[in-house]
Amino acid sequence: MSIDAQTPEKIRIEDVYKVYGRKEALAVELLRQGADRQRVLAETGCTVGLAGVSTGIPAGRITCIMGLSGSGKSTLVRHLNRLIDPSAGRILLDGRNILDLGMPDLRELRRRHISMVFQAFGLMPHMNVRDNVAFGLLVRGDPRQQARQVASQWLERVGLADYGGHFPDELSGGMRQRVGLARALAIDAEVLLMDEAFSALDPLIRYDMQDQLLELQQRLRKTIVFITHDIQEALRLGDQIVILRAGRVEQTGTPQEIRERPANDYVERFVVQRDEHRP
């Protein structure tokens, strides 16, 4: 279900399949006929990443994509900026199929329209914090002085104004992830992809980062796709939640819909797990 009828979709994922192996077309056809991963592997030797995923990502909201390890959530998010291309299906950004983009337009998409935050921070150890934040701006050709000014502004917004001259190995894990977040936001992209961005952090630092993301989102209203395996994190952050299992969508809904009307036993187990871990 969509969040509400007034919220436009920023991204539309239509019947997306991803399989790895030589008999790709046959594997997709078997999946369309209802075959599971085990049968596809046995008959084609192909490994299934995604099996007919369709969902919408509403503009200006946080969509959490969650599931267990191997469910396809990281594979899916990497399709949204074409780090991975699908075996079949379409991915529309503002109504335009990004699979039709040539390399120059794809580079422009990644430099200006979609940014990404990874679990492993991805900071360059030989650059100081300010230059790490400015990196995306410099890559797309912004003047160095302007890029560093923008980087300093974002460091202030994430609470690291005094750390611009430090190097990544001088920072804690939480601080490094703040740098990664500032770097992603500095290019002012409309879409922010966050792949298990807080998963490696200690629980208290993770909670603080969730708070900071929610606070920034109140002001920025970005379209955020947040990957997590933690139902508590998804329910706390998400305006919409998409739950995957074995490369398929089990349920899409608001946190309230997921809690009150789980689509099946699989989704209900996530909700029960969340309630069992509440203090």
Where are these regions (language model features)?
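Conserved ABC ATPase "signature" C-loop
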Residues: 246-247
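Helix-to-loop junction immediately C-terminal to a conserved catalytic motif
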Residues: 81
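ABC ATPase "signature
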Residues: 252-253, 261
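Short coil-to-helix segment of the ABC ATPase nucleotide-binding domain corresponding to the Q-loop/switch region
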Residues: 127-135
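A short, proline-enriched helix->beta-strand linker immediately N-terminal to the Walker B motif
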Residues: 186-190
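Conserved ABC ATPase "signature" region
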Residues: 30-39, 96-97, 145-162
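Conserved ABC ATPase signature
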Residues: 167-171, 175
